[in-house]
Amino acid sequence: MSETPRLLFVHAHPDDESLSNGATIAHYTSRGAQVQVVTCTLGEEGEVIGDRWAELTVDHADQLGGYRIFELTEALRALGVSAPIYLGGAGRWRDSGMRGTAPRRRQRFIDADENEAVGALVAIIRELRPHVVVTYDPHGGYGHPDHVHTHFITAAAVASSGVAAGLEVGADEYPGKPWKVPKFYWSVFALSAFEAGMNALQGKDLRPEWTIPPREEFYFGYSDKDIDAVVEATSDVWAAKTAALTAHATQVVVGPTGRACALSNNMVMPIFAQEHYVLAAGSAGNRDERGWETDLLAGLCLDGFDAR
């Protein structure tokens, strides 16, 4: 009898899950895996696209976070996930804002009590018992403070969730039955995929107000030799990812052909058909000629489950 695979994605704000891992999430839910997404803040400090949402922002009604709960719920539904999970509960920690911005509100995620935040995620891991956990790399992708802190909290929680209670140094201080996560991945962007995606775009894929970003904007990309795994989107999975991005209407605009999108800065991003990963902990399974796994579950004993 096969065991249902369980995957857990941990992100900082609503929309991060769709931008970084939308294809991967839809890939596994469409094959019967149990996938959950933990979001650490409501993205209250985010910029919005267009005048329609302007009154929601922090300088006006400060209701953007509440609205983004709706957006995230719709995006996850498009990806096949039943409902969002919020670290500590919805609104427990607030979006910290971009690096260099003045702290305007208390309870910023980057100021969260470490023991409380790690403990909240340990409790989720021990309850869900995921075979795979995914979050950002140590730089938080492009470096948003909440992304960096999400990496730190997730790495600590993955390490702590498998520690049994006892008197020894490092013994368990969190409730729940220990669960050692078999595989822990960082979600990363491949330079080769960015370049291929940008080169494939045509005028019909773009909106008039969009601009082409210089390559230096993608300074956080990874070379192929540093990547361990890839998940490739089928047409159905691609459609699910595009629908999820469209659901985040305050943050993302999808282009006319569904091949590209842009955030509030109007810089074009390809909607990637491949999503790439670095294996941070655990044992790799079979690799292809590039040296990449093509299944995040590779090497795990889940008899009878087909993730292809």
From Swiss-Prot:
This is 1D-myo-inositol 2-acetamido-2-deoxy-alpha-D-glucopyranoside deacetylase. SUPFAM superfamilies: LmbE-like. Its EC number is 3.5.1.103. One of its GO terms (molecular function) is N-acetylglucosaminylinositol deacetylase activity. The gene is mshB. Zn(2+) binds at H13, D16, H147. Belongs to the MshB deacetylase family. GO terms for biological process: mycothiol biosynthetic process. It catalyses: 1D-myo-inositol 2-acetamido-2-deoxy-alpha-D-glucopyranoside + H2O = 1D-myo-inositol 2-amino-2-deoxy-alpha-D-glucopyranoside + acetate. NCBIfam families: mycothiol_MshB. It is an enzyme of class 3 (hydrolase). Catalyzes the deacetylation of 1D-myo-inositol 2-acetamido-2-deoxy-alpha-D-glucopyranoside (GlcNAc-Ins) in the mycothiol biosynthesis pathway. Its cofactor is Zn(2+).
